[in-house]
């Protein structure tokens, strides 16, 4: 006869086996219901546009609806926290960017440690940003704008989508390299920030090409330079800031990645990564992204993890050295 200890061991092993079978089954059956992508910024920005382009195609690949839901606020913290609290079952995902690498510096009381709370799935796209000013701005080029800023510390204001967002950090890096003091005005997303820029309430903004190209082409804002080392195909004739602002090697590319709660099964992550890479390889998606100034990326979940770690190091040094988390440059 089995001893009580042996019986307990058999029961325990049986429970473990059943739990493993449950995980395997959930991964094998995944997805069996609609999937939510949480975008922690308002509609209309680059991250929202990229998400909607890809969600439709991924929905077709997975055979389940993929809906994009906007949860803006606190530089992406509110939406990210919602995903961090969600079940790790692959049905609530996060689309985020540089903010996920710098939250801890700007929001020390945030309810999650991003690197522990989330697992990377795939890099979706990268987009250069563009320095823009209101259409009636006296500044015709980046050099004159920065020269005025240097002579008048704190009088040139710049908008961002929130503290720690990629467009905040891009402008802050430009200011740091140029040795100028700018006044940061954070918003709850790039869309309301752009509206105030167009209205002339702000001096400048470094925003994604995706969000700004229609305003540039309609003459509502003036583009002074792009943050890529080469001219952007979607904005021919606009020089790189490395040249236009006399800042050699200045380059900032906004990236967008797909993430899941960290406890999510690796098998589910693999399903999502495969579907995302298939979507990003289609000519339709590549053209749709190119039309809004973005470049399709893809790759392994591990590659996104490496990028994420590099961004934590890169921006952490800038934030600490220039005290950006106190809203000072």
Curated annotation (Swiss-Prot):
Q: Does the keyword Transmembrane helix apply?
A: no
Q: Which UniProt keywords apply?
A: Periplasm, Plasmid, Signal
Q: CDD domains given for it? A: PBP2_Bug_TTT
Recorded hits in InterPro entries, A to Z, give: BUG, Bug_dom1
Gene3D superfamilies membership? Bordetella uptake gene, domain 1 (3.40.190.150), Periplasmic binding protein-like II (3.40.190.10)
Q: Name one Pfam family in it.
A: TctC
Per the UniProt entry, the signal peptide is 1-27
Q: Can you name a GO cellular component term?
A: periplasmic space
Intracellular or extracellular location(s): Periplasm
Xref: SUPFAM superfamilies: Periplasmic binding protein-like II
Q: What does the sequence similarity comment in the record state about its family?
A: Belongs to the UPF0065 (bug) family.
Q: What is this protein called?
A: UPF0065 protein in clcB-clcD intergenic region
